[in-house]
Amino acid sequence: MLGARVAAHLDALGPLVPYVPPPLLPSMFYVGLFFVNVLILYYAFLMEYIVLNVGLVFLPEDMDQALVDLGVLSDPGSGLYDADSELDVFDAYLE
């Protein structure tokens, strides 16, 4: 057979291009980058879940007083918005 003789002759010559193993480091870099991105997405959705579902439970009723307790505002009167004064006006209007 002619094909078998040609194949044997080419095998005897050896490879025409020397074998170069594929670089392992860049591929492992991209695998690591993928897992880092997965972790970032996991923690982003976890924080979103905590803020939207758990954090709303712990919001105080009086935000001005909460800011005073934290030391952000010096006194409750320095708040930007006072809802109690508007309720007093509406109560007087209804009576």
From Swiss-Prot:
UniProt signal peptide: none
Disulfide bonds, paired cysteine numbers: none
Pfam families the record matches: Dexa_ind
Superkingdom of the source species: Eukaryota
Organs and tissues of expression: Highest levels in heart. Also expressed in brain, liver, pancreas, placenta and lung. Up-regulated in emphysematous lung compared to normal lung.
Induction annotation: By dexamethasone.
Alphabetized InterPro entries for the sequence: Dexamethasone-induced
Annotated family: Belongs to the DEXI family.
Protein's name according to its UniProt entry: Dexamethasone-induced protein
UniProt organism field: Homo sapiens (Human)
Gene: DEXI
